[in-house]
Amino acid sequence: KNLATSLQAEYPKDKLHVLVTKSNSNNFTYDGIELGGERTANEVEEEIKILEKDGNKVTKISIVGYSLGGLVARYVIGLLYAKGYFDRIQPVNFTTFATPHLGVRSPLLGPHNYLWNVLGARTLSTSGRQLFTVDSFRDTGRPLLTVMADPSSVFIRGLAKFKHRTLYCNIINDRSVVYYT
């Protein structure tokens, strides 16, 4: 909320609308990237409808995600792109902070890494399976993160529409999203 508050303080209300999505709060984060992305996309679409019903014209969109939220945001972009939103709304900024874009599997450098990969994927529900890339996305037979990285996917084609694509991460002392992710 600090980012939202800072942006709202900097820009006039009639020029900037900030939506802090709520549909994936609390334990809903365990439902996975796909379901979380669908819920968030619905929230974004509803907000756009409300703004336009109130006489506002939505002309640009920027999307920010933190940690798992960055992956959810990438999924949302694919859904919005597939529905044609970017034909009428200009995608400007896509930014993620501490997001494990490559998943969280540890390189197999010893038994503790193997144990982490096995237990993590099985104890963190759908989100864990997707982050550890042991899931199978729909009928593709491939993990969701692999599908989302495919250049021909709606996820990459939608992401490519954004004028600015930025990721921020720590290269040391970040145990939750380590450097190889």
What do the predicted segments below correspond to?
Residues G37-S152, K163, D174-S176:
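Serine-dependent carboxylesterase/thioesterase catalytic core
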Residues N2, D31-G32, Y179:
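Short, glycine/acidic-enriched capping/hinge loops at junctions between secondary-structure elements
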Residues F155-T181:
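C-terminal catalytic-base region of ester-bond hydrolases, centering on the histidine
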Residues S25-G36:
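Catalytic nucleophile-loop/oxyanion-hole region of alpha/beta-hydrolase
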Residues V18-T21, F94, R165-L167:
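Conserved beta-strand scaffold positions in the cores of enzyme catalytic domains, especially
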Residues K1-N27, L80:
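Short, surface-exposed "cap/lid" segments of acyl-processing enzymes
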Residues S23, T99, N170:
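Active-site donor-binding loop signature of nucleotide-sugar glycosyltransferases
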